[in-house]
């Protein structure tokens, strides 16, 4: 398995893994499958242009191009007094790879790249996602707050989000 940075030309790969994540883990993300499934190629190209998106890449067999098996994005803050920060978003690893260490490798690769440009990385994780909370704590992220009712999940209520940060330098 390789870790690659997706380019705007890879928008179809990104869209496929992103839609899978939204379909299988709807309570974990601020967006929805329905919303992103309706978006154009330009939407996904823009996400790849404005962020650094890393993918766990499984090379294909017999000349096939391969597939993304996991993904995460890191986007910079834009304000002049916030350029020392980035936001980690959209982390998803296919179920059969969870617990294999590949998610940790993906995250660490992203943090190593981010450390060359920013001093700290922030993220949010739904309070009910205890596996993700444990994963980020093991990676050195610390909680600094909680936003109640952060996500309103259609027909199933609200999700609180835990705010986390990792200082890189």
Protein language model regions, located:
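Residues at secondary-structure transition points
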Residues: 9, 39, 79, 83, ...
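Conserved acyl-CoA
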Residues: 105-120, 142
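C-terminal "cap" of GNAT-fold acetyltransferases
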Residues: 119-130, 138-169
């Amino acid at each position: 398995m390789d870790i690659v940075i997706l380019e705007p030309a890879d928008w179809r790969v990104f869209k496929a893994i992103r839609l899978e994540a939204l379909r299988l883990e709807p309570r974990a993300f601020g967006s929805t499958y329905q919303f992103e499934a309706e978006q154009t190629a330009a939407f996904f190209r823009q996400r790849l242009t404005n962020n650094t998106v890393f993918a766990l890449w499984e090379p294909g067999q017999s000349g096939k191009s391969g597939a993304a098996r996991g993904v995460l994005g890191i986007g910079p803050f834009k304000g002049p007094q916030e350029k020392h920060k980035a936001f980690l978003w959209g982390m998803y690893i296919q179920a059969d790879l969870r617990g294999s260490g590949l998610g940790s490798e993906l995250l660490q690769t992203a943090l190593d790249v981010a450390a060359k440009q920013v001093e700290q990385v922030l993220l949010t994780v739904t309070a009910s996602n205890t596996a993700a909370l444990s994963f980020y704590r093991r990676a050195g992220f610390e909680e600094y707050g909680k936003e109640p009712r952060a996500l309103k999940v259609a027909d199933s209520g609200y999700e609180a989000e835990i705010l986390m940060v990792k200082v890189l330098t």
